[in-house]
Amino acid sequence: MQMKKISCASLSPDDMLSLLEITRSYCGTADSWQTLRPLLERKEVWGFYKGTSLVGYALFTPSDRQLGGSVTLTCFRYRWEYNDETSLLQMMELIPTSFAARFHCLLMDVSRTHELNLDFYHRIGFCESILPSPKGRGNVVLLADLKSFPVMKKEKR
C-alpha cells in the first residue's frame, strides 16, 4: 500500500469515482462530484492506493499557531473491504512517513462511543484528552508524536 498527495485537478476519472463511492459509503450527502469537490479543495488530501486502485483517503488540516507543528486528521475513509486491522494499520503507518518532516504531532477527534477505534489508535501510539462536545458527551482528541510512531522507530534501526 502507498499514500500519495492528490488534488481534484490531478485525479483520473477512476479515482474521482472511487472517492465518490468511498464517501457515499460513509454518508449519503455526497451525491455528486460537485458536492464533494469543494470539501476536498479546502483540505490537504492524501489517497491510499493498493497498486493503482484508490482504496481510501484522508483529509488533513495544518493546525493553527496555538498548536503549531501539528496536523489534524479530519477525515479518514476507506473501502469497506479494507476495514480490517491489517489494512488500517498499513494506512495509518503511511501517515508519519508522509508528514514527520513537516509536523511533529498528529491530532484526531474521535467520538467516545467508538471504543474499538479508540483501542486500535491507542495500540498504535496515540494518547488522549477528553474534550466536552457541544452536546455534552465529550469527544476524545487523540495525539500522536509522528516521530515515535512504531513505523518510524523501525526506520531508525
Could you describe each region identified by the protein language model?
Residues 67-81:
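Conserved acetyl-CoA binding element of GNAT-fold acetyltransferases
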Residues 25-51:
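Active-site rim helix/loop that mediates acceptor-substrate recognition in acyltransferases
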Residues 120-131:
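Conserved acetyl-CoA-binding loop of GNAT-fold acetyltransferases
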Residues 83-97, 123:
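Conserved acetyl-CoA-binding loop-helix of GNAT-fold acetyltransferases
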Residues 107-118, 134-137:
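Conserved beta-strand-loop-alpha-helix junction that forms the acyl-donor binding cleft
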Residues 47, 53-63, 69-72:
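Conserved beta-strand in the GNAT
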Residues 43, 101-105:
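Short, high-confidence coil segments that cap the C-terminus of an alpha-helix
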Residues 1-31:
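Short amphipathic alpha-helix that is part of the acyltransferase structural core
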